[in-house]
Amino acid sequence: MSETKRIKTALVSVYHKEGLDEIITKLHEEGVEFLSTGGTRQFIESLGYPCKAVEDLTTYPSILGGRVKTLHPKVFGGILCRRGLEQDMQQIEKYEIPEIDLVIVDLYPFEATVASGAEEPAIIEKIDIGGISLIRAAAKNYNDVVIIASQAQYQPFRDMLMEHGATTTIEERRWFAKEAFGVSSHYDSAIFNYFDGEEGSAFRCSANSQKTLRYGENPHQKGYFYGNLDAMFDQIHGKEISYNNLLDINAAVDLIDEFKDTTFAILKHNNACGLASRPTVLEAWNDALAGDPVSAFGGVLITNAVIDKAAAEEINKIFFEVIIAPDYDVDALEILGQKKNRIILVRKPAALPKKQFLSLIHISEPTRHS
């Protein structure tokens, strides 16, 4: 493994430029030279810093409507060359290939384009080729190269620059490589799932957002949630959601989505212990509670109707962990928020997933004994 490396040349080619200016400024102050393409090069030059066009290095223009820009040996040779291997260094000298020590790149917004409802030709154009290749090349050669593969890595990279300038340790480069392969694998999973549609020919699941929970099913276990809870709920009151809360919330959402009329449900340990559909939310609550008033203690409550003051006054008479509704009247929130730890969630309207998965029969790696 190599020692600390200094960044001398950076290749920068990004779709999203927010937050990039601070990094470019700091790199320029450290004497780093820039290579870039199209809009990113214009962005760097607009900050007042010189930037060499990739086309000047390769002697080829961007072609095929921008589909081919960086795919060239003079780019990838500079990224993949092993600085400690004499043969590699002789070849890049022979072919006049500059060493590239830092790659900052992000990917076309494929998932956002799919979610927008765009037609397939527009979606296909958002399948990144050059960017994903740059990410993999730089991550593979983390021994010599730093790869910044998404905006999510800007902050740790900024912190690193501020701490010790344009130098990196092998541990830092390896960490960024790990993050980069996470970006590339997630991106490819999204593309596969788009083409797979509802066929279900294989299971590919990737979630970028991780939330550390208070603990797992039991206090001695760790628990994590992968996904974006904020896209599904606004938590407007209460303690942090636990692993067991999430299990009950999931069961509650699955249940309430079966009903169109005003409905209230009470769940405990993933099972409904009371449910009623009635003309008003107050009536629905009263009859749902009547189903099993004992088991309702400490449960999760959910309704598909706005909770008003009258319903809140009755609901507030029992102890419960979580309540979920599409909205609450102001007076209702004031009543329900009297208990500090009570979790109050507003459920956001969201499209149901095309596929649902259930994890069964967990098989772990066998314990190896020496």
Predicted feature locations:
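Conserved acidic residues
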Residues: K8, D101, E321
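Feature captures the catalytic cores and cofactor-binding loops of soluble hydro-lyases/lyases
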Residues: E18-I23, E30-K74, G78-R82, Q87-I97, ...
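Active-site loops and adjacent core secondary-structure elements that bind or stabilize anionic groups
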Residues: A152, P156-M160, H164-Y328, A332-L360
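Single conserved hydrophobic/aromatic residue that forms the stacking wall/gate
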Residues: I361-S370
